[in-house]
C-alpha cells in the first residue's frame, strides 16, 4: 500500500495525504451554510448539491460555487459549501450524520486528504454499515504538502534553504535541554505546535511522518514498525516539544500573528506543522486563508518559511467523494459530476494556484516561490499514506505517547446559568457536556475542578475548589459527582477567578506537561473588587512560552463577554471558543479538549 516516491510531485486523483486547518464555527456559518442540505430540488426548481469541505479550501470552494453557472441536462444547480474538520466529518458519517449536531448533510465530502476516506471506510466496516465512499480511487481537486513552518531567522540558523532539514532536526532540538542554545541561538527552548491527529490532517500526517522518520526508511509504515521501542521513543520525544494540540492550526497561526504585531514573532513558537498553503496565507497577513479577508492585515514582520522534511512528507489531495448514500439520488450525482468538472477546469485550477495550492496534478503556480518562503522544487520525497489499520493505530498510539496535560476546569455557576436554553437550563446543558467531555482526557492527564460566581455562601472568595488535581483515572468519579451537583447562584467574578487560577497553575508548571485552564462563563465581569483587565492581561502574558499556563475560555450563551475572553486567551497564548448558542456546547467542549 503505502510507500514513497521521488519528485515530480504528481497526485492525479488517487491516494494522497495532508493537513486540514479547521475553521472554528459552532454557532452556524454564513448564509450558504444554512441552506437545504438534502439533495433533490432546491430553490426555484434547482437541484441542490451540498458539499462538506475541509476548511483550508472551503472559502475558495464557496467562491467557485457562487461563480459557477451550473446547468445539468437543462436544469440549474445550486451548490452550497460547508466547512467541517476532516476528522469530525469522518466520525459524523460513520455514526450517522445528525444535522442538528453536525450541520447540513453532505452529498459530496471533500476532506483534506484521502487518509480520512480510508479511515471512514474502516469505521463503517467495523460498525457493519454500508461503505459511503467506495473502493475506487477518488479524484483530487487540489494538493498541498505537509511542511514544518518556522520563523525565517530560526530556519536560516539551521541552514535553510540550502541544507536539507527534517524531523531529525526537530528531535535533536526537542531532546537537548539547551534548546536553541545547542545551535548557538538565543531563542530559548524549542517549542512545537502540532494539532490533534484525531481531528486534523496536519496532526495526523505530522504524526505519521514522525513515525516514518523514526524507522530510518521511506518504505511502508507497518504495525510492526509502530511496536518498536526505538520508534516509539523517537515519536514520544518529538511530542515533548509540543506546547498544546488542538483541532486547527489556525490557533497557532493567529497567535503567531498577534505576537508578530507586538514585535514578538520569535517568542511565541519555534515551529508548527501545517500545509504549504498555510505558510503562504500567513505570509500574506491572512492566516485564515479566506480569500475575502486577504489584504485586510499587513504582512508579518517575521515571515514563516517551509521546511519539507528530508525523511519524506505526505500530501493532501483534497479528494472529491460523491457519497454512496440513499439521499444522493441521480440528479444530485449528475450535479456533483458537473461541479467536479468545473472545479478541475483550467480557470478554476488557476484560482487554486493563485491561493498557493498546487493543482490536482501536483503542478505549482507563481505563489510557490522562495520569495514567499516556499520551494517549488520540493518536496523531493513524497510518502503515500499507510494502510487504514496502520493509520488507526497511529491515532491510538498517539493517545498513549502524547504530552500529558494538567488542566483546571473552571465553571461559571452565576445565577444567569439557571436561565432556560430550550428544554433545559444553560447550566444543565453545560454540566451534561462537561460530563461527556471527561472521557476525552488521556490516562496520564491530571484534572481539577473549580466553580465560580461572586463570593459563594460560606466563602469570602468568588471561586471554590471542588476537586484538587488528581489523575483522571482516580478522580473521574469525584469529578462526575461534583459537576453533577453544580447549581446557579450569585454574579460573575471573571477577572478575580482568572487571576487566581493563573497564579495557582503557575506554581506547578513543568516542561513535561501542558498546563492549561478551561474556563466556561456565560456573562461579563460583575465583581467590583477586581475590575482591572489591563493588569490581568499583563500578568497572563508569559515570559517563557515553553513554561506557561494557557487559557482556553468558552463564551457560553448570547450574553458572554467574548471580546474580553479573546483578550484573556491571546494574553495566555491559548484560544477563545464561541458557544453563544448553548446547544453547541457539546461540540465546543470537544474542540477545547482536543488541545490536550
Language model region names:
Residues 2-30, 45, 321-411, 428:
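Extracellular/periplasmic juxtamembrane helices and adjacent flexible linkers that interface
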Residues 3-13, 20-135:
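Early extracytoplasmic/lumenal segment of secretory-pathway proteins
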Residues 125-199:
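A conserved helix-loop-strand patch within extracytoplasmic ligand-binding domains
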Residues 134-148, 232-246, 294-327:
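Periplasmic-binding protein-like
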Residues 209-306:
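Ligand-binding pocket segment of bilobal, Venus flytrap-like solute-binding proteins
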Residues 292-301, 523-580, 584, 590-592:
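VWA/integrin I-like adhesion module and closely mimicked acidic/polar interface patches used
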Residues 403-471, 497-498, 516-521, 553-556, ...:
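Von Willebrand factor
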Residues 420, 446-485, 504-511, 528-534, ...:
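Short beta-strand-loop
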Amino acid at each position: 500500500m503505502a510507500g514513497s516516491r521521488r519528485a515530480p510531485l504528481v497526485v492525479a486523483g488517487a491516494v494522497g495525504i495532508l493537513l486540514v486547518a479547521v475553521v472554528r464555527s459552532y454557532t452556524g456559518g454564513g448564509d450558504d451554510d444554512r441552506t437545504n442540505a438534502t439533495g433533490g430540488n432546491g430553490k426555484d426548481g434547482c437541484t441542490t448539491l451540498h458539499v462538506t469541505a475541509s476548511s483550508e479550501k472551503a472559502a475558495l470552494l464557496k467562491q467557485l460555487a457562487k461563480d459557477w453557472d451550473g446547468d445539468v441536462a437543462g436544469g440549474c444547480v445550486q451548490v452550497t459549501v460547508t466547512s467541517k474538520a476532516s476528522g469530525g466529518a469522518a466520525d459524523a458519517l460513520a455514526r450517522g450524520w445528525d444535522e442538528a449536531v453536525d450541520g447540513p448533510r453532505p452529498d459530496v465530502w471533500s476532506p483534506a486528504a484521502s487518509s480520512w476516506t480510508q479511515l471512514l471506510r474502516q469505521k463503517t466496516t467495523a460498525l457493519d454499515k454500508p461503505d459511503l465512499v467506495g473502493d475506487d480511487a477518488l479524484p483530487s481537486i487540489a494538493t498541498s504538502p505537509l511542511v514544518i513552518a518556522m520563523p525565517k531567522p530560526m530556519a536560516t540558523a539551521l541552514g535553510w534553504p540550502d541544507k536539507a532539514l527534517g524531523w531529525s532536526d526537530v528531535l535533536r532540538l526537542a531532546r537537548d535541554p539547551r534548546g536553541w542554545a545547542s545551535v548557538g541561538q538565543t531563542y530559548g527552548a524549542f517549542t512545537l505546535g502540532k494539532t490533534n491527529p484525531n481531528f486534523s490532517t496536519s496532526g495526523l500526517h505530522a504524526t505519521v511522518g514522525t513515525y516514518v522518520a523514526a524507522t530510518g526508511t521511506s518504505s511502508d509504515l507497518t504495525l510492526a514498525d509502530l511496536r518498536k521501542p526505538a520508534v516509539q521513543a523517537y515519536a514520544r520525544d518529538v511530542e515533548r516539544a509540543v506546547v498544546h494540540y488542538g483541532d486547527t492550526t489556525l490557533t497557532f497561526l493567529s497567535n503567531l500573528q498577534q505576537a508578530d504585531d507586538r514585535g514578538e514573532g520569535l517568542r511565541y513558537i519555534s515551529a508548527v506543522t501545517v500545509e504549504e498553503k498555510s505558510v503562504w496565507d500567513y505570509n500574506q497577513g491572512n492566516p485564515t486563508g479566506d480569500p475575502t479577508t486577504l489584504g485586510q492585515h499587513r504582512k508579518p514582520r517575521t515571515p514563516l518559511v517551509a521546511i519539507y522534511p528530508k525523511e519524506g512528507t505526505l500530501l493532501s489531495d483534497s479528494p472529491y467523494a460523491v457519497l454512496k448514500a440513499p439521499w444522493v439520488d441521480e440528479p444530485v450525482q449528475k450535479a456533483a459530476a458537473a461541479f467536479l468538472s468545473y472545479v478541475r477546469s483550467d480557470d478554476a485550477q488557476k484560482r487554486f494556484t493563485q491561493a498557493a495550492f498546487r493543482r490536482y496534478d501536483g503542478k505549482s503556480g507563481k505563489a510557490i516561490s522562495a520569495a514567499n518562503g516556499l520551494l517549488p522544487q520540493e518536496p523531493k520525497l513524497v510518502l503515500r499514506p499507510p494502510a487504514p489499520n496502520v493509520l488507526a493505530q497511529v491515532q491510538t498510539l498517539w493517545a498513549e505517547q502524547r504530552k500529558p496535560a494538567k488542566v483546571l476546569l473552571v465553571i461559571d455557576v452565576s445565577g444567569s446559568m439557571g436561565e432556560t436554553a430550550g428544554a433545559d437550563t444553560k447550566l444543565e446543558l453545560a454540566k451534561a457536556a462537561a460530563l461527556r467531555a471527561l472521557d476525552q482526557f488521556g490516562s496520564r492527564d491530571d484534572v481539577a475542578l473549580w466553580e465560580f460566581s461572586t463570593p459563594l455562601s460560606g466563602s469570602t472568595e468568588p471561586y471554590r475548589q471542588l476537586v484538587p488535581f488528581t489523575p483522571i483515572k482516580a478522580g473521574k468519579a469525584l469529578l462526575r459527582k461534583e459537576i453533577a451537583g453544580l447549581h446557579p447562584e450569585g454574579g460573575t467574578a471573571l477577572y478575580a477567578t482568572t487571576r487566581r487560577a493563573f497564579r495557582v497553575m503557575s506554581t506547578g508548571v513543568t516542561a513535561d506537561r501542558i498546563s492549561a485552564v478551561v474556563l466556561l462563563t456565560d456573562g461579563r465581569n460583575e465583581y467590583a473588587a477586581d475590575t482591572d483587565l489591563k493588569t490581568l492581561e499583563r500578568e497572563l502574558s508569559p515570559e517563557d512560552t515553553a513554561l506557561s499556563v494557557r487559557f482556553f475560555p468558552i463564551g457560553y450563551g448570547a450574553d458572554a463577554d467574548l471580546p474580553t475572553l479573546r483578550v484573556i486567551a491571546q494574553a495566555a497564548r491559548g484560544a477563545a471558543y464561541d458557544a453563544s448558542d448553548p446547544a453547541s456546547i457539546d461540540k465546543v467542549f470537544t474542540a477545547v479538549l482536543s488541545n490536550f
